């Protein structure tokens, strides 16, 4: 029997919200195809994330950030009906970790929010970042801003929190769908990438430390 979750995550026919695409013919589109080809060929994920010889680091990172955003979006989208104000009144990763939302607009101070509200603000915020031409230029030859990697670190740290919440609070739903292997593959790909380029502080990775040690040994 076909797995609907697998179809959603890997064929990406359905999205939680509009996803950013790469324009055919651009350098970044070619990098995206190269990255996908490595995954489809079954290449070791540790090797698949490495910067190809002669390629620009910022371009490689940009391609992966957009891809991870799309994939994490879909993972959360598949369990979002079970992540409600009632079931998850606080955005957390178990009893030891609570994530508060802060931005430059409405929430200038770290604010406790329900998980679905936090997720909605998070996805809106990331979407705004990756659609900002000043941060993620799409024209070949347009330089990335000096704060690009700093912004990427913030994006990836916040995306990691989605994995934390899903694994700790909604893994039963993932298992019920028979989709743990697919979510685990997405997580390993994400983890190896951020470790390869030092894009998330070790402290931020603590909530899933034991699971990661077993899964990504």
Swiss-Prot record:
Alphabetically ordered keywords of this record: Metal-binding, Zinc
**Could you say which residues bind Zn(2+) here?**
83, 88, 165, 170
Q: Name one Pfam family in it.
A: Mob1_phocein
A single GO CC term, please?
Answer: cytoplasm
Q: Please give the SUPFAM superfamilies that the UniProt record associates with this protein.
A: Mob1/phocein (SSF101152)
Q: Tell me one GO biological process term.
A: signal transduction
Q: Answer whether the UniProt record assigns the keyword ATP-binding to this protein.
A: no
Which gene name belongs to this protein? MOB3A
For this UniProt entry, the molecular function terms from Gene Ontology, in alphabetical order, are: metal ion binding; protein kinase activator activity
Recorded family membership: Belongs to the MOB1/phocein family.
| Name of the protein | MOB kinase activator 3A
- Native organism: Homo sapiens
Give the function comment from the record: May regulate the activity of kinases.
